[in-house]
């Protein structure tokens, strides 16, 4: 695994962690909160984004305008059944979700969830490091690398890992600040 391949893989892991962070509620409405909701539409699980336009008319409201009005009730049911704790309001044409301010207890829960997502991201990064180092050691064993080259390559992999873990930590700190901001 070349250094650029490793960095590319690690970048993807960081981006996946960032996407996970985006699904965590903060004090204001954000359409990405609904990214993980899928609706059973004509017998198939369909992402909500594919069925409707999501918008945030103000900081406390998410508005969902389905492309097909017949999907309105299905979308409403999927949102109500999700673990987000939202109560959708259906007016016959659009669904509005009022995003209530978070209680201190919920803020702490969401901080724990963000920490969990960050840890999952770091584990994924460490797994990539392990794979890269195993490959380097294998190449050393086969005689492609000298011992010094192997050590230098392993140090380079570790430095790359440290850089990306610091990035995940930075994203976590930013997300926690967003969550805790009243």
UniProtKB/Swiss-Prot annotation:
<keyword id="KW-0648">Protein biosynthesis</keyword>
<comment type="similarity">
    <text>Belongs to the RRF family.</text>
</comment>
<dbReference type="GO" id="GO:0006415">
    <property type="term" value="P:translational termination"/>
</dbReference>
<dbReference type="InterPro" id="IPR023584">
    <property type="entry name" value="Ribosome_recyc_fac_dom"/>
</dbReference>
<dbReference type="Pfam" id="PF01765">
    <property type="entry name" value="RRF"/>
</dbReference>
<comment type="function">
    <text>Responsible for the release of ribosomes from messenger RNA at the termination of protein biosynthesis. May increase the efficiency of translation by recycling ribosomes from one round of translation to another.</text>
</comment>
<protein>
    <recommendedName>
        <fullName>Ribosome-recycling factor</fullName>
    </recommendedName>
</protein>
<dbReference type="GO" id="GO:0043023">
    <property type="term" value="F:ribosomal large subunit binding"/>
</dbReference>
<dbReference type="InterPro" id="IPR002661">
    <property type="entry name" value="Ribosome_recyc_fac"/>
</dbReference>
<keyword id="KW-0963">Cytoplasm</keyword>
<dbReference type="InterPro" id="IPR036191">
    <property type="entry name" value="RRF_sf"/>
</dbReference>
<dbReference type="GO" id="GO:0005737">
    <property type="term" value="C:cytoplasm"/>
</dbReference>
